């Protein structure tokens, strides 16, 4: 029987691969038989992740996701190394929290550049390659997964920049699905709740912990390892008829008032 989730022979580009969800994604993609292109700004954390994986299944790329030229070069390197790119996970993220009236132009722009503009650059670069493959007769298409958040659906106090960017990523997934669906290129979003990563340390701290936990029916945070299972499913042929969707992986947080 064919496994529901397999990435055997697939090459997946993962941005923000140095820690948290991205690190777990690289590990799981390789565990499922795929190749991972690990993209991260931090050379040290990215290097640690890559060093722990089989050298013939991973390609390291250092730089900012908001650099469009880097996206183009990385895709070209991945194709030269592995033959093709079959999937993309736009996972890189930062937070610059502040209430609306106190948020600076730079705080706003930093978050938009990484989450929204960066996701567009990498989607365009990977999508151009996928479309070329389709023109060449390869009908396998591809899968793009945007790492969004419940903040994009419900808003987030003190994070209008983050919430707006994540909402934009939801719209991006639906637009990709509409434009490229006829080429068998799928696009979906995963809306994470609170995952145990370095980026969520503040909201998992004593000041906010009890209030947020009370809104999660399962009563616990997600681990990166369980969070990425949904992403890998959407990348796989098990999700071959799923596109334009927003999948909540949040312990039920989205149904809380």
List the predicted regions and their residue ranges:
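Short C-terminal tail/terminal secondary-structure segment
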Residues: 2-4, 154, 232, 243-257
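Conserved glycine-rich Rossmann-like NAD(P)H-binding loop of the short-chain dehydrogenase/reductase
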Residues: 32-47
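Substrate-binding pocket helix/loop in short-chain dehydrogenase/reductase
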Residues: 99-100, 104-112, 212
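Active-site helix of classical SDR
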Residues: 123, 165, 173
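C-terminal helical subdomain
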Residues: 189, 210-238, 242, 249-251
């Amino acid at each position: 029987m064919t496994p529901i989730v397999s990435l055997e022979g697939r090459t997946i580009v993962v941005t923000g691969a140095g820690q948290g969800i991205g690190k777990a994604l690289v590990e799981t993609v390789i565990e499922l038989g795929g190749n991972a292109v690990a993209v991260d700004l931090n050379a040290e954390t990215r290097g640690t992740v890559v060093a722990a994986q089989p050298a013939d299944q991973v390609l390291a790329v250092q730089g900012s996701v908001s650099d469009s030229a880097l996206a183009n070069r990385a895709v070209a390197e991945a194709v030269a190394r592995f033959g093709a790119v079959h999937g993309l996970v736009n996972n890189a993220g930062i937070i610059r929290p502040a209430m609306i009236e106190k948020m600076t132009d730079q705080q706003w722009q930093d978050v938009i550049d990484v989450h929204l503009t960066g996701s567009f650059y990498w989607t365009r670069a990977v999508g151009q390659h996928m479309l070329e493959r389709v023109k060449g007769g390869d009908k396998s298409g591809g899968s793009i997964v945007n790492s969004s958040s419940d903040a994009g659906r419900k808003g987030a106090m003190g994070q209008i920049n983050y919430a707006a960017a994540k909402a934009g990523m939801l719209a991006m997934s639906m637009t990709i699905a509409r434009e490229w669906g006829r080429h068998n290129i799928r696009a979906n979003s995963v809306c994470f709740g609170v995952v145990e990563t370095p980026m969520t340390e503040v909201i998992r701290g004593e000041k906010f912990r009890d209030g947020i936990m009370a809104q999660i029916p399962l009563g616990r945070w997600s681990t990166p390892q369980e969070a990425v299972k949904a992403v890998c499913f959407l990348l796989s042929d098990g999700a071959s008829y799923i596109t334009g969707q927003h999948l909540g992986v949040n312990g039920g947080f989205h149904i809380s008032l």
